[in-house]
């Protein structure tokens, strides 16, 4: 479309608008003047201005009613409960021994040695038969003023004996001709019963003082390893030590006799693993390297099994004894050639010579190096006699001068064996001193102990007979 017509149409619209204005003006009434009338103002009405002015309205503050602020609610923070590690049970106290006394014992009396029986003419050749009690009582000899009684018989071969708090006699016993065995107990009427087992080659036994808890030495196996076991009153058997040296011979040289010392510790004798150290080597200073803990007496904490060497240089400490002052004694079975049977008075950290016996007549033994200091024997015992059990007399039945004397069983069937001998420790310094026979006529006496009534009780290995020696006065 041409531009001109658009412009022309616009002009026409403007002209129309102007015409309408003139029309309304012409139609107004004649003579009246048009006036603006003010809008009446409302009383107390607010006045509005172009820019509003803010007039603050005071709103009264609310009356504060105190509200108790609640105590903060403690939301526990979760802390994991600690894992309870049981505190170790307090170590049980060691029961120490009350020193024995001979108060009330008979007055001192001279003691003559036991006589010797005829060795022939019995029901079974050299000795009475096992069940010939009358024959045995005729054969067994004791000093004047004493007499022997038959107490009972253990089955099998007893090794060592001790009394319990119940007044009964307990023994380690080999069963059925083997090295296996158990603990047996002999009642007051002489009957026996099996108390605890099984053990391999059970040997020593000792009650912890003031308790019915029994400790037993034995082997772990027949040919290797020795140890100590605890037997609780309910029959539970628990190993205390199971790594001790063992076993030179089938029936010997293993963990042997047991005894509780005055300090409450348990002592055990441990035999050597050789006859005279021939399988050992020497260090540069000449000391023979024996296996750890062999040929020694060990001191054991009975509750934990911790132990150390108390004394050493003892080839085969078979049994231990304790006197009224707390001094320990040990028997020692010597070499297979017969040399070295002796009684020793033990001291802490002492060395008693084995295997350095070249200067004592053993040509196969080692020479003692200068670095080793040894203590002498208390008493030498007859060659090949094989001392086994030993006890210190601490009862009050025998005369007072026998208190703290030692009684030793000489086991072997040699001229000066098969008997119990008495040793007075106060007389041994006399160069002419010799042990005195106290019980003769036995076949294989293996152990001896003091009974609750103060008599001495000895047990024989072959038939298991138990004999009591009573003082008549």
Where are each of the predicted segments found?
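Residue position within the beta-strands of beta-propeller blades
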Residues: 170-172, 215-217, 267-269, 330-331, ...
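Asp-box/WD-like beta-propeller blade repeats and closely related beta-sheet repeat scaffolds
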Residues: 201-202, 222-260
């Amino acid at each position: 479309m041409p531009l001109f017509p658009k412009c022309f149409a616009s002009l026409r619209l403007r002209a129309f608008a102007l015409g309408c204005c003139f029309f309304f003006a012409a139609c107004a009434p004649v003579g009246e003047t048009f006036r603006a009338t003010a809008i009446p103002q409302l009383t107390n009405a607010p006045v509005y201005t172009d820019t509003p002015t803010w007039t603050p309205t005071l709103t009264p503050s609310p009356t504060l009613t105190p509200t108790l602020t609640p105590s903060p609610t403690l939301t526990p923070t979760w802390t994991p409960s600690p894992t309870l590690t049981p505190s170790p049970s307090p170590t049980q106290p060691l029961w120490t021994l009350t020193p024995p006394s001979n108060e009330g014992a008979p007055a001192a009396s001279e003691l003559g040695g036991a006589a010797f029986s005829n060795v022939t003419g019995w029901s079974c050749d050299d000795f009475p038969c096992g069940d010939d009690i009358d024959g045995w009582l005729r054969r067994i000899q004791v000093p004047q003023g004493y007499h022997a009684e038959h107490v009972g018989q253990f089955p099998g071969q007893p090794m060592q004996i001790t009394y319990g708090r119940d007044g009964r006699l307990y023994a380690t016993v080999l069963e059925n001709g083997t090295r296996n065995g158990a603990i047996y107990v002999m009642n007051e009427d002489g009957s026996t019963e099996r108390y605890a087992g099984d053990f391999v080659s059970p040997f020593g036994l000792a009650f912890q003082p003031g308790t019915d808890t029994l400790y037993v030495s034995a082997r772990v196996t027949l040919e290797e390893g020795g140890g100590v076991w605890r037997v609780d009153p309910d029959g539970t058997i628990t190993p205390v030590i199971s790594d001790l040296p063992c076993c030179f011979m089938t029936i010997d040289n293993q963990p042997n006799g047991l005894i509780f010392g005055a300090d409450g510790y348990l002592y055990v004798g441990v035999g050597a693993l050789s006859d005279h150290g021939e399988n050992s080597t020497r260090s540069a200073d000449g000391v023979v390297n024996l296996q750890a803990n062999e040929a020694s007496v060990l001191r054991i904490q009975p509750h934990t099994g911790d132990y150390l060497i108390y004394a050493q240089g003892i080839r085969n400490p078979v049994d231990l004894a304790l006197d009224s002052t707390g001094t320990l004694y040990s028997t020692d079975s010597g070499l297979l050639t017969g040399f070295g049977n002796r009684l020793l008075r033990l001291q802490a950290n002492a060395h008693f010579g084995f295997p350095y016996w070249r200067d004592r007549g053993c040509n196969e033994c080692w020479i003692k190096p200068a670095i080793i200091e040894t203590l002498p024997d208390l008493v030498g015992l007859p060659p090949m006699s094989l001392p086994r059990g030993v006890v210190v007399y601490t009862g009050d039945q025998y005369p007072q001068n026998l208190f703290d004397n030692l009684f030793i069983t000489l086991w072997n069937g040699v001229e000066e064996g098969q008997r119990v001998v008495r040793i007075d420790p106060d007389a041994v310094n006399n160069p002419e001193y010799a042990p005195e026979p106290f019980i003769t006529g036995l076949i294989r006496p293996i152990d001896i102990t003091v009974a609750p009534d103060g008599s001495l009780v000895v047990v024989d290995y072959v038939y298991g007979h138990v004999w009591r020696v009573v003082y008549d006065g």
